[in-house]
Regions:
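Bacterial Sec-dependent N-terminal signal peptides
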Residues: 1-30
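C-terminal functional modules
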Residues: 373-493
């Protein structure tokens, strides 16, 4: 396990005032604003690689039984721009310090993390501040214009290309990345992650032929020939340690109303997917009846479309499965993943099916599935016995899972997306939701009169303090005064 030093920028600022006691914090003790990049990077990694639970309600893995959850019923309204005020400001600081110390590697990471955050922001909202963003301190620019979503995506792809170039240079000259809690300082591994993430971004844009100057399909082919994540040992993942502030996010979580979704349980049961045993617990009713963990009939979920009280009744009757306790009883949990080998293989499989690259879609599909089982076998502790290589081979023979060349391209993509979906349990943030918007898969249960949203409305603070730019962006995209969660952004038109 890599030693982790997680120091917030605020703490660094306080420590910098005491250079006589903490002389190694600043390369220049006469400049209190100078902070070694190795002290900034851990916090950036921690924030980017952690995964939350909010999206799991929206993409139908869990239900709430002790209250009404707006994500579960697609009733959210406004998002926030906290990435601008927190994470991206840290990334800007990393760039400043990278330039100060002349580090190629940190510059590469700057471009990667900028791309990562702006990718997520534009998926959430549509048009966002990009070219003029984060310039308040340098240029006193506090009301940045909103760039079109196409321009933002084009910029994200440019940044990832720069990340590849800078990290390749750093690797070639043997530059070690100090403060790297993901890859232990290896620039070549970050290069692989950046390139793999670039493929993910390009596939997100599968409904588009061009994005600014970028030709989506030809660029995908070009990037697919670059260094990529090659096995589970190269996953872009954050491993936790049993230390205050560095433990697994769900450790000791209070889950009084956190239960499995019926649609997810039914899907996994239908194809006899043993990963269900890692995700959920048998119902109390099944346990009392003596059913084994490996008995698929021991699992049940709640209906995500009914009032929470109906699912609460299932809790009282012992007829609904809880989330597996392994997620909250182990302080180190399992690593949380920004992007891993299993997902990358499914990205490549879909690209082959779409005709973007040459290759064997079946091989990529099966390799991705086996990689998922192998990963869980490594980290699922007492549940590892249910996801052996033999279990993966058996699962691959199920009629609803196995690769069949007789299937249509659309049917093949549906199977690929389902495998990406399965590896998203406590790992996906909002990715499976955006995959659904892009492909229609997996299909989500929802009330007939409640359309699935496409985005979040802009923050109130933007409407108040950046009024004209917000109005212009809304009108340009959706029509005047049409900032709605059901307004469709450019990327899926």
């Amino acid at each position: 396990m890599k030693t982790r030093i997680l120091i917030s920028l605020a703490l660094v600022g306080m420590l910098a005032c005491s250079c006589s006691d903490f002389g190694d914090l600043n390369d220049n003790p006469n400049d209190p604003a100078a902070v070694s990049p190795k002290l900034i990077l851990p916090n950036i990694c921690e924030n980017a690689f952690r995964r939350g639970t909010g999206g799991m309600y929206a993409y139908k893995m869990v239900v709430q039984t002790d209250g009404h959850n707006t994500d579960q019923f697609y009733e959210w309204n406004r998002g926030d721009f906290s990435f601008y005020n927190n994470e991206l400001l840290q990334v800007v600081k990393l760039k400043e310090e990278a330039d100060r110390v002349g580090s190629t590697a940190y510059n590469g990471l700057y471009h990667f993390f900028r791309a990562y955050y702006f990718y997520n922001l534009t998926l959430q909202f549509g048009d966002i501040p990009y070219s003029e963003a984060l310039q308040g301190e340098q240029k006193a620019l506090f009301t940045p214009k909103y760039d079109t979503q196409e321009m933002v995506f084009s910029g994200v792809l440019d940044e990832l290309a720069l990340a590849n170039e800078e990290l390749a240079k750093a690797a070639a000259k043997g530059e070690q990345i100090q403060g790297d809690i993901i890859y232990g300082g290896a620039a070549s591994m970050w290069q692989k992650l950046a390139n793999s993430f670039r493929l993910k971004v390009l596939l997100t844009l599968s409904n588009k032929q061009t994005v600014g100057k970028h030709q989506v399909q030809s660029e995908f082919r070009q990037v697919a020939s670059l260094p990529l994540i090659s096995d589970n040992s190269e996953n872009g993942q954050l491993q936790y340690i049993d230390q205050e502030g560095n433990r697994y996010p769900q450790f000791n979580a209070q889950w009084s109303g956190f239960y499995m979704d019926k649609t997810f349980v039914d899907r996994m049961t239908a194809c006899k997917d043993p990963r269900l045993f890692l995700f959920a617990l048998p119902t109390n009713e099944a346990s009392n009846a003596g059913k084994a963990v490996s008995d698929f009939t021991a699992y049940a979920g709640g209906n995500p479309t009914v009032p929470y009280g109906e699912n609460k009744n299932l809790v009282g009757a012992g007829q609904i499965s809880q989330i597996n306790a392994r997620y909250r009883i182990h302080p180190t949990g399992e690593p949380t993943m920004l992007l891993g080998y299993a997902e990358l293989q499914q990205i490549l499989a879909e690209a082959v099916v779409r005709g973007w690259i040459a290759g064997d879609a079946k091989r990529h599909y099966e390799e991705g599935l086996k990689a998922s089982f192998a990963w869980y076998h490594t980290y699922a502790r007492e549940y590892a016995k249910y996801v052996t290589p033999q279990d993966a081979e058996k699962y691959l023979q199920h009629d609803a899972v196995k690769w069949d060349e007789a299937l249509s391209a659309e049917q093949k993509i549906e199977r690929i997306i389902f495998q990406k979906y399965c590896v998203s349990f406590f790992q996906g943030n909002w990715d499976p939701f955006f995959e659904h918007l892009r492909t229609g898969y997996p299909k989500f249960a929802h009330l007939n009169n409640t359309p699935i949203p496409y985005r979040w409305m802009y923050p109130d603070t933007e409407s108040k303090y950046n009024t004209e730019n917000v109005k212009e962006a809304v009108t340009r995209q959706f029509g005047e005064n049409n900032d709605k969660i059901t307004s469709k952004p450019w990327w899926i038109k």
